[in-house]
Curated annotation (Swiss-Prot):
Keyword set, alphabetical order: Calcium, Collagen, Disulfide bond, Extracellular matrix, Glycoprotein, Hydroxylation, Metal-binding, Repeat, Secreted, Signal
Source organism: Rattus norvegicus (Rat)
Descriptive protein name: Collagen alpha-1(XI) chain
Pfam family, one: COLFI
Classification via PROSITE patterns: NC1_FIB
GO biological process, one term: skeletal system morphogenesis
InterPro entries: Collagen, Collagen_superfamily, ConA-like_dom_sf, Fib_collagen_C, Laminin_G, TSPN-like_N
Glycan attachment sites: 351, 1638, 1707
Underlying gene: Col11a1
Length: 1804
């Protein structure tokens, strides 16, 4: 046998083997996934047009190679279609994984179920809801997933009035929706592993059972297939694009090709039916020859391109390997059969067979997604389930070499394809500016174009020789339906009927549902149509048509490009002098301007010394713009400016004159064909263009009936130009046509908009100055002008009204202290203020006279143990030397030796207080006195407050206390001012009342032990110190470091009284304490010398406007100030906002095209345009310029106490006020219970000076010191380290007073000085026996002042009671605040704290102190024992009488129940008539309890009288809890029968008497024993009845609120709309709130946004970005809501209100200027629609919320000022009220918006 014969025989056997294998695999693949899809429309008999179904045009109006459009069905709301599920799934098995495929066009804006599948129990198992937010409902036999887990595709909107191809794939636990073959969304589907869908029920089309919403719209195809991958191929296999032919033979012309292989499937697209027709078997398998295979190579590639099952990124997980066309075995088996086994249906095999038999199609090379590297062997088909398992094909020689997708076919031409050129770069978008587009006349005919490329592929060639026999085809799809059969049996559901013969069947809810199912299953007799057939194959491209006749002159074209700028025109004539422009509006605050004009003279201040010449300050803030001046003369024309940057694209200019004809362009090379774009929306017809050469076939238009070709008619007139349509997709480039003849000149176009201004003309000559015009409207803000000259001082204006509170201005410079005013009259005591922050410590005052013995203070905390000093006897008291001038700081001196011991002097009698002497100059420091002998060691005293040693400050005079003024409301705390200069000491005032104890200060650092102090007299018993034996007096040790704070020791016993020590030396000034609040003003200090100029401080925040003060007297006219330096010219301010658009001028003639000029100089301001229409209500404007101060207004009323302000900075120490009048002494209150230990307080404010103490023991006179002369002013040195204390020197002899030295710099504020010497000890009281707690007494008057102790936790404010006995020893308290200032001693170093002296004798009554701060709420005290009952109180105020209820019908008499507890006591009635038998029992006076038992809360009632209105319980106090009823008192003598009830003729029902009489008849006289109790019972019953009436029919008042307005309307249908109180949680009515009830709308409950959320005015918002939430704006915030009284609403109440609500609505009004709010007419979309944020933080928009509607959409057209009203009416209550809004359409030059937020209304 010849070699070629052997090879050919082997090859034939090989081909047969391959074919057999392929057919075997295909057959198995069909078994796996080849089940025919279920055609729902066919099963439901849509093609016979049941009720509510009609035929209409479908998805494609025309298809390639098809005359007729697709047929779809229009479904209206009358359609009621259903069928048994088994009719659709005859096998009774619904696939576990499946695809639902449908092509629909729902009615715009609808949302309804397209398919509902129920099981035999009436439970919906499957549903597809389509519309604005599609939902896939699935519930298997286990009830999974639950409804809240149904997949919701909220980002998809298929109810937009357009056709959509939707495929849903359900595989395992995911559901994927593919819309229009592009958008793919996958959601989890939480179903069971083996979920089952029952097919024993029915399927309902277009709705759900018992639901009113039905599907309305068009549907073309509706399939369910058991292949979950079919959804991915929906647009390839089931519903191809309109420009593709069906991949099977066209079903619209059914025939069987003579070459058709077996099992070619014909898909009919006529109306969504699938005709499964098997072609006749071809008996002979065609032989595949080499020629056929060679021809087939391109077809296989091309046809596989049509079955691209996803992009490479989706399915290809590794790059394909390049495989050469080697002779490897089984290429088809490896390359294709794997794909077929995966379940891909018939099309791939069909195309292989079809192309082998029909001839080939040229390879295209433009769409091959699967060809990556160029050879055919690089096809990688993967099974869908196994994306990672790659099977590589190895092509055999018989397939030939593949062609790479990248290859350009320029060298070869395969089957008539022309060479494709490379695609050119995309051109820049044209920018046509006004004046640039000048349309010329048509040019002359151009030269003939270049030879065009070869045409598109021609028709298929003749059939080739019969090929080898192909493999057996797959089994065909089921055949077409047969004739309708006889009516089938109805679906019978076995129902269990209950009841007997006389009663109808008992129907359960499920059976009723199933009956509804049966009613909807009545249209199950006719056979439904099948699915649509496949699209036909694309037809050949037609050849070029003949040249058309010359067209008529076209309409005016669009404006041409802007011409080159022409040369400047001739100089214009001088214009007339224009009128001055109108004043501009207030601009935005500019940059800091130059120095402003001098303001009006203020009130003259106190004459001060001339200060230093100030340095030049930094540039100040901008001044307010001045009024516009008269327009200046025109300046000379400036030099030509440099060229500016290209301006923005301008408006379309007027049509220019035609330009010369241009040269014909070179023909472009045909680019490759681009991918098919989506079909754009149908545009409106554009203007007719000139006839062009025929282009390639465009997108199919709507298919009309094909008429016979008519003869050419006469030339018609050009029609009117239509509106421009939307840009369609770009067509393929056509061939270059020949240039046509020049057309006739078209008519002039319409007047275009005004073009850009031309170049600036030459300056004209000055015109004649015109008359001054009237003042125009206020223009917009101009730039800030330069500072003008100072104007003349104007006349004093009249007194203006008090203006509203301005915004906080910057902090002004500190003013000088004014003169001290006369004390005003004492006002009434104000309310007690809140606890203020402790003030700064004051300067130490002089030692006052000895105070009276105070009450025992609270025990202080244990201080640190001081070093034990050597007790000396009291030395002689030296005379006080004159205060010397402050010297410079000396070096640390050595510790002096102790002085000689002095003798103790005797106590002198207390002398009378001396008159106030003049303030002497400060004397020099005395020498240390001689050391005294050691005295007896006293018991350990309380440790003192060791302070860190500061520098010694000047001793100030103590000013007299001022009179108590009216306690005003607590003002906001001001910011801390700088520390002022220290004033001269004032003279000591008379003693003031001791204030309340200050809060404890923080513990200071431990100070060094001071010098040895003089022993004092025995003090009161101190608290026991730390335990330890007392040692002998040791020598003074060196100062130790500060120890840590030790733990609090146990409470010690009272120590024995120590001797009284003399006053120690004044301690040094300590560190400044924490800043306290500003104290009351002190007296005016002497005028200090001006300090040096400080640096410029930062501008403080504006202070809050205080109340209007009293008008001060007019001061003398001040002398004119010096002229200030002229300020520098400030920088130009910011650009003002754009002015109103002027009127359009007439169009100018087109200028010659000149070169682009440089930007000219800015022209002068134009005149203001005419006044525009009334604009919409604007927001509040920016704050206007601050006006000049008017004269003082009238005295305002005293305001209410304001809220506490923020803590201000420390102000200057004010002058001390004059002494106030002494207040009356109140009785001493009882000791309070010990409060819990409070936190350490801050340092207390300076207390008033106490009365002068008794004279101390006389000390030995020291040697006189020499008088020091006034030293020079010392500079303030740095604070040095604390030196060790020196021993006290002997006092010097009083020297002559030195001269006053110059005033030094202000020193730091010192701590208060040490306390003065304690008074003599009083007798120690014994612990009294605790008495019974009495009733709360009336608050006592304030007691005499006690020593400052630690403030306990504030108790409730009470008046001071009478003095109680001294209490037992209290717990050890925390360390107290530093005491009041001690007497002025000679300056020395701080000594150790001496032992506590005994209590002094009670002093005279002190003056009343300034009211202290309000304490915080203390813990409630223990409950006292019940006191004896008081006398019967006066009757309480009558309660609010409820509205009388309607009179009820007479009820049946009830039995008398057990005697209940006594009810609320009514108001005492008039005395009743005495009974005939016996006198009534005596009225118990005074509520003395009867002997029979304990006293109940109410006393025994008085004699019954006729009922008055129900009173409140008690004597106008709050109602307490009801107590147990007391035992009844002894019964009075019996009254006549029935008389008990007579006093209650109104309150008691009529049946009561009869009922009582019947009981009396049965029970005899026993009932009379309870006459008093019965009246209380009936009163209680009546009260209960009224309460129940109020609960059933609430009145909507604050005390009787309703749950919602709907409840109120149901209770009182005649109530008008208005404001009512509601309490949704129905608890205590104290949390009720007031709402607006809209009964007209059905009882809506409405709440309102707060003032700042009501809306914003129309503005351009230049600094904000579109697409931002309003809360992110600089001036934005989240929207919040209040009740109608402006109070915030409790969150719990809002939650209850929403629980009681079925739907809620809220309106939102968007005010716009050229800005869209909802629908955009220009783009035809909702892309820029508003978005809202609901209260549940859920975003609401057009796409995801069908409950938002535009009631009026004026902003859609973007024309001028309009508004859009949007209503959110939703059953999702949590979305309302909205709390934020996103605005998307603003930012352009003319766009503005504002909005108004309406109330949120809830309807129950």
């Amino acid at each position: 046998m010849e070699p070629w014969s052997r090879w050919k025989t082997k090859r034939w056997i090989w081909d047969l083997t391959i074919s057999t294998l392929v057919l075997t695999f295909l057959f198995q693949a069909r078994e796996v996934r080849g089940a025919a899809p279920v055609d729902i429309l066919k099963a439901l008999d849509f093609h016979n047009s049941p009720v509510g179904i009609s035929k209409t045009t479908g998805f494609c109006t025309s298809r390639k190679n098809s005359k007729d459009p697709d047929i779809a069905y229009r479904v209206t709301e009358e359609a009621q279609i259903s069928a048994p599920t088994k009719q659709l799934f005859p096998g009774g098995i619904f696939p576990q994984d499946f695809s639902i495929l449908f092509t629909i066009k729902p009615k715009k804006g609808t949302q309804a179920f397209l398919l509902s599948l129920y099981n035999e129990h009436g439970i919906q198992q499957l549903g597809v809801e389509v519309g604005r937010s599609p939902v896939f409902l699935f519930e298997d036999h286990t009830g999974k997933p639950t409804p809240e887990n149904y997949p919701l595709f909220s980002t998809v909107n298929i109810a937009d009035g357009k056709w959509h191809r939707v495929a849903i794939s359900v595989e395992k636990k995911t559901v994927t929706m593919i819309v229009d073959c592009k958008k793919k969304i996958t959601k989890p589907l939480d179903r069971s592993e083996r979920s089952i869908v029952d097919t024993n029920g029915i399927m309902v089309f277009g709705t759900r059972i018992l639901e009113t919403d039905v599907f309305q719209g068009d549907i073309q195809q509706f399939l369910i297939t058991g292949d979950p991958k079919a959804a991915y191929d929906y647009c390839d296999h089931y519903s191809p694009d309109c420009d593709l032919t069906s991949k099977a033979a066209q079903a619209q012309e059914p025939h069987i090709d003579e070459y058709a292989p077996e099992d070619i499937i014909e898909y009919d697209y006529e109306y969504g039916e699938t005709d499964y027709k098997e072609a006749e078997s071809v008996t002979e398998m065609p032989t595949v020859t080499e020629e056929t295979v060679a021809q087939t190579e391109a077809n296989i590639v091309d046809d596989f391109q049509d079955y691209n099952y996803g992009t490479m990124e989706t399915y290809q997980t590794e790059s394909p390997r390049r495989v050469s066309g080697s002779n490897e075995p089984n290429p088809v088996e490896e390359g294709f059969t794997e794909e077929y086994l995966t379940g891909e249906d018939y099309d791939v095999q069909r195309n292989i067979s079809e192309d082998i038999l029909y001839g080939n199609k040229g390879i295209d090379g433009r769409d091959s997604d699967l060809l990556v590297d160029g050879d055919l062997g690089e096809y990688d088909f993967y099974e869908y389930k196994e994306y990672e398992e790659r099977t590589t094909t190895s092509p055999n020689e018989e397939f030939g070499p593949g062609v790479p997708a990248e290859t350009d076919f320029t060298e070869t031409s395969i089957n008539g394809h022309g060479a494709y050129g490379e695609k050119g770069q995309k051109g820049e978008p044209a920018v046509v500016e006004p004046g640039m587009l000048v349309e010329g006349p048509p040019g002359p005919a151009g030269p003939a174009g270049l030879m065009g490329p070869p045409g598109l592929q021609g028709p298929s060639g003749l059939p080739g020789d019969p090929g080898d026999r192909g493999p057996p085809g797959r089994p065909g799809l089921p055949g077409a339906d047969g004739l309708p059969g006889p009516p089938g049996t109805m679906l019978m559901l076995p129902f269990r009927y209950g009841g007997d013969g006389s009663k109808g069947p008992t129907i359960s809810a499920q059976e009723a549902q199933a009956q509804a199912i049966l009613q909807q299953a009545r249209i199950a007799l006719r056979g439904p149509p099948g699915p649509m057939g496949l699209t036909g194959r694309p037809g050949p491209v037609g050849g070029p048509g003949s040249a058309g006749a010359k067209g008529e002159s076209g309409d005016p074209g669009p404006q041409g490009p802007r011409g080159v700028q022409g040369p400047p025109g001739p100089t214009g004539k001088p214009g007339k002098r224009g009128r001055p422009g109108a004043d501009g509006g207030r601009g935005m605050p500019g940059e800091p301007g130059s120095k402003g004009d001098r303001g009006f003279d203020g009130l003259p201040g106190l004459p001060g010394d001339k200060g230093h010449r100030g340095e030049r300050g930094p540039q100040g803030p901008p001044g307010l713009p001045g009024d516009d001046g008269m327009r200046g003369e025109d300046g000379e024309i400036g030099p030509r400016g440099l060229p500016g940057e290209a301006g923005p694209r301008g408006l379309l200019g007027p049509r220019g004159t035609p330009g010369p004809p241009g040269q014909p362009g070179i023909g472009g090379i045909d680019g490759p064909q681009g991918p098919k774009g989506n079909m754009g929306p149908q545009g409106e017809p554009g203007p007719p263009g000139q006839q062009g050469n025929p282009g390639p076939q465009g997108l199919p238009g709507p298919q009309g009936p094909i008429g016979p070709p008519g003869e050419k008619g006469p030339q018609g007139k050009p029609g009117l130009a239509g509106l421009p349509g939307a840009d369609g997709p770009p067509g393929h480039p056509g061939k270059e046509g020949q240039s046509g003849e020049k057309g006739a000149l078209g008519p002039p176009g319409p007047q275009g908009p005004i073009g850009y201004p031309g170049p600036r003309g030459v300056k004209g000559a000055d015109g004649v100055r015109g008359l001054k015009g009237s003042k125009g409207e206020k223009g917009e803000d101009g730039f800030p002008g330069f500072k003008g000259d100072m104007g003349l001082k104007g006349d004093r204006g009249e007194v203006g009204q008090v203006g509203p509170r301005g915004e906080d201005g910057p902090e002004g410079p500190k003013g000088r202290a004014g003169p001290t005013g006369d004390p005003g009259p004492s006002g009434q005591a104000g309310e007690k203020g809140k606890l203020g922050v402790p003030g700064l410590p004051g300067y130490p005052g002089r030692q006052g006279p000895k105070g009276s013995t105070g009450f025992p203070g609270f025990p202080g905390a244990n201080g640190e143990k001081g070093a034990r000093g050597i007790a000396g006897k009291p030395g002689p008291r030296g005379q006080r030397g004159p205060t010397g001038p402050r010297g410079s700081r000396g070096a640390r001196g050595p510790t002096g030796k102790p002085g000689p011991k002095g003798t103790s002097g005797g106590d002198g009698p207390p002398g009378p207080p001396g008159e106030r002497g003049p303030q002497g100059p400060q004397g020099p420091v005395g020498f240390p006195g001689p050391k005294g002998p050691p005295g007896p060691a006293g018991k350990d005293g309380l440790p003192g407050h060791p302070g860190q040693r500061g520098e010694t400050g000047f001793q100030g005079k103590t000013g007299p206390p001022g009179p108590g003024g009216v306690v005003g409301p607590q003002g906001p705390t001001g910011e801390t001012g700088p520390i002022g200069e220290r004033g001269h000491p004032g003279t000591p005032g008379p003693p003031g009342e001791q204030g309340l104890p200050g809060a404890a200060g923080k513990e200071g650092a431990k100070g060094d032990p001071g010098p040895q102090g003089i022993s004092g007299k025995d003090g009161p018993a101190g608290i026991r110190g730390f335990p330890g034996e007392r040692g002998l007096p040791g020598a003074q040790g060196a100062p130790g470091l500060k120890g840590g704070e030790g733990p609090q020791g146990p409470q010690g016993p009272i120590g024995s009284p120590g001797e009284r020590g003399s006053a120690g030396t004044a301690g040094p000034i300590g560190l400044p304490g924490r800043p306290g609040p500003q104290g009351p003003p002190g007296p005016a200090g002497e005028k200090g010398a001006p300090g040096e100029k400080g640096p410029q401080g930062p501008a403080g925040r504006d202070g809050v406007q205080g109340p209007v003060g009293l008008p001060g007297p007019a001061g003398p006219a001040g002398s004119p100030g010096e002229d200030g330096d002229k300020g520098e010219i400030g920088e130009p301010g910011q650009k003002g906002s754009k002015g109103d658009k002027g009127e359009n001028g007439p169009p100018g003639p087109p200028g010659l095209q000149g070169p682009v000029g440089a930007p000219g100089i800015a022209g002068g301001d134009g005149e203001a345009g005419p006044r525009g229409q009334q604009g919409m209500f604007g927001q509040k404007g920016d704050e206007g310029a601050r006006g000049f101060p008017g004269p003082p207004g009238p005295i305002g009323l005293q305001g209410l106490p304001g809220p506490p302000g923020e803590k201000g900075e420390n102000g200057d120490v004010g002058p001390m006020g004059p002494p106030g009048p002494p207040g009356p002494r109140g009785p001493q209150g009882p000791n309070g219970a010990d409060g819990p230990q409070g936190p350490p307080g801050s340092i207390g404010s300076v207390g008033g000076v106490g009365e002068k103490g008794e004279p101390g023991e006389a000390g030995n006179p020291g040697p006189p010191g020499e008088a020091g002369s006034g030293g020079p002013k010392g500079e303030r040195g740095e604070k040095g380290e604390a030196g060790p204390p020196g021993a006290a020197g002997p006092p010097g002899i009083k020297g002559p007073p030195g001269d006053d030295g110059p005033k030094g710099n202000p020193g730091p504020v010192g701590f208060p000085g040490d306390p003065g010497p304690p008074g003599e000890p009083g007798p120690a009281g014994q612990d009294g026996v605790g008495g019974d707690k009495g009733e709360d007494g009336d608050p006592g008057q304030p007691g005499p002042p006690g020593p400052s102790g630690e403030a306990g936790p504030p108790g409730p404010p009470g008046k001071r009671g009478p003095p109680g006995a001294s209490g037992s020893e209290g717990r050890q308290g925390e360390k107290g605040a530093k005491g009041e200032a001690g007497a002025e001693g000679p300056p020395g170093k701080t000594g150790p704290v001496g032992p506590q002296g005994p209590s002094g004798k009670p002093g005279p009554e002190g003056l009343r102190g300034i009211p202290g701060p309000v304490g915080e709420q203390g813990l409630p005290g223990a409950a006292g024992q019940d006191g004896p009952p008081g006398p019967l109180g006066p009757p309480g105020l009558p309660g609010l009488k409820g509205d009388p209820g309607s009179k009820g019908e007479k009820g049946h008499p009830g039995l008398i129940g057990l005697i209940g507890p006594p009810g609320e006591q009514g108001e005492k009635g008039d005395r009743g008539l005495p009974g005939t038998q016996g006198s009534p029992g005596a009225k118990g006076d005074g509520g003395i309890p009867g002997p029979a038992g304990p006293i109940g809360p109410p006393g025994p009632p008085g004699l019954p009288g006729p009922a008055g209105p129900k009173g409140n319980k008690g004597s106008s106090g709050p109602t307490g809890q009801k107590g147990d009823s007391g035992m009844p008192g002894p019964p009075g003598p019996p009254g006549p029968p029935g008389e008990v009830i007579q006093p209650l003729p109104i309150l008691s029902p009529k049946k009561t008497r009869r009922h009582t009489e019947s009981i009396q008849a049965d029970a005899g006289d026993n009932i009379l024993d309870y006459s008093d109790g019965m009246e209380e019972i009936f009163g209680s019953l009546n009260s209960l009845k009224q309460d129940i009436e109020h609960m059933k029919f609430p009145m909507g008042t604050q005390t009787n609120p309703a749950r919602t307005c709907k409840d109120l309307q149901l209770s009182h249908p005649d109530f008008p709309d208005g404001e009512y109180w509601i309490d949704p949680n129905q608890g205590c009515s104290g949390d009720s709130f007031k709402v607006y009830c809209n009964f007209t709308a059905g009882g809506e409950t409405c709440i309102y946004p707060d003032k700042k959320s009501e809306g914003v005015r129309l503005s351009s918002w230049p600094k904000e970005k579109p697409g931002s939430w309003y809360s992110e704006f600089k001036r934005g915030k989240l929207l919040s809501y209040l009740d109608v009284e402006g109070n915030s609403i409790n969150m719990v109440q809002m939650t209850f209100l929403k629980l009681l609500t079925a739907s809620a609505r809220q309106n939102f009004t968007y005010n716009c200027h050229q800005s869209t709010a909802w629908y955009d007419v220009l783009s035809g979309s909702y892309d820029k629609a508003l978005r809202f944020l609901g209260s549940n933080d859920e975003e609401m928009s057009y796409e995801n919320n069908p409950h938002i509607k535009a009631l009026y959409d004026g902003c859609a057209s973007r024309k001028g000022y309009e508004k859009t009203v949007i209503e959110i009416n939703t059953p999702k209550i949590d979305q309302v009220p909205i709390i934020d809004v996103m605005i998307n359409d603003f930012g352009d030059q003319n766009q503005k918006f504002g909005f108004e937020v309406g109330p949120a209304c809830f309807l129950g």
